[in-house]
């Protein structure tokens, strides 16, 4: 939320996982600048014409150079939807079990769908399997969709305030976010938070 307020973003959500093991890190570009070129995992690329490309792990590993026009890449994964179809065996991925989720889908160039699903809150929301999460994007008309960093990192911020319920009442440092828009009406970093994404402690206990 701090990052969204710092840049006065209208909407912000969790992006890539920059703290994972070297093996699971992928190619990373930000604003067209390459910070890491090697990749062994799937890749989502956002382009300057407001479109999206998704490469599976095999194709991403064969990339000698990123395609012209790519502005940003994300490598958490896995891909959820390709060519309008939910990817096979998506629930078998390393993060396939029920969890809080964050993801981005594309309907057409310039038309994106951002979704965060709460979880790990037994009396509120358990989370989602990846296949069920993918179906949300399909229902919104997405022809492509990609899974981003979820779990305790899953966060969505609108006008500087949390709009989802976080899996932990402890603030996790999120090193990367996707941000959209700009508004002077967004509070500054020093302003108090009206919505903090917190839930009552008993929502986290037991099963329901």
For each feature predicted by the language model, list its residue ranges:
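Gly/Ser/Thr/Pro-rich low-complexity, intrinsically disordered segments
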Residues: 1-208
